[in-house]
Design a protein with these regions (language model features):
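Hydrophobic alpha-helical segments and helix-packing faces
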Residues: 2, 20-23
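Compact nucleic-acid interaction/catalytic patches
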Residues: 22-24, 28-62
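Short, charged beta-turn/beta-strand-edge "cap" motif at the junction between a beta-strand
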Residues: 14-18
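C-terminal terminal-subdomain/extension
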Residues: 1, 64-112
Length: 112
C-alpha cells in the first residue's frame, strides 16, 4: 500500500523519548509519495486531541472521523511498512493540505 501526501492513518510512535509523541495515534503524511518510493520513509505529523493551542498546531476541519490538531513541531520520518500501517482512515481536502504545508514551510524560514 502506498501512503500519499494528505492521507491520515494510525501509527505507533513508540519507542520515543522525552517530549516526543508516544503511543498509537493518528498521523498525517506530509511528504510526497515519491519520497516513500525511493527511500522507504514518509514524513508524518502526529495528530493530538489536546486543548492546547500552539502556533505549530493546525486544527483539522475537512475530516469526518479523525478529529484533532496536526502537530507540525513533532514531524518525523518513519518506515510505515515496518510499523504495520495498512489502512488509510481519511484523506484531507486539497485546500486544507495546502494550508498545512504552507504553515509547515514557515518552520524552516530563515531567521533574521
Amino acid at each position: 500500500m502506498v501512503i500519499k501526501q494528505g492521507d491520515i492513518f494510525y501509527v505507533d510512535f513508540n519507542p520515543s523519548k522525552g517530549h516526543e509523541q508516544k503511543h498509537r495515534r493518528p498521523a498525517l503524511a506530509l511528504s510526497h509519495s515519491l519520497l516513500t518510493k525511493f527511500i522507504g520513509l514518509t514524513i508524518v505529523a502526529p495528530i493530538t486531541t489536546t486543548s492546547r493551542n500552539f502556533p505549530t498546531y493546525h486544527e483539522l476541519t475537512s475530516t469526518r472521523t479523525i478529529q484533532g490538531k496536526v502537530m507540525l513541531d513533532q514531524t518525523i520520518a518513519l518506515d510505515l511498512a515496518a510499523r504495520g500501517v495498512s489502512k488509510v482512515e481519511e484523506r484531507l481536502s486539497q485546500e486544507e493540505l495546502k494550508l498545512i504545508l504552507d504553515k509547515y514551510k514557515l518552520l524552516f524560514d530563515m531567521e533574521d
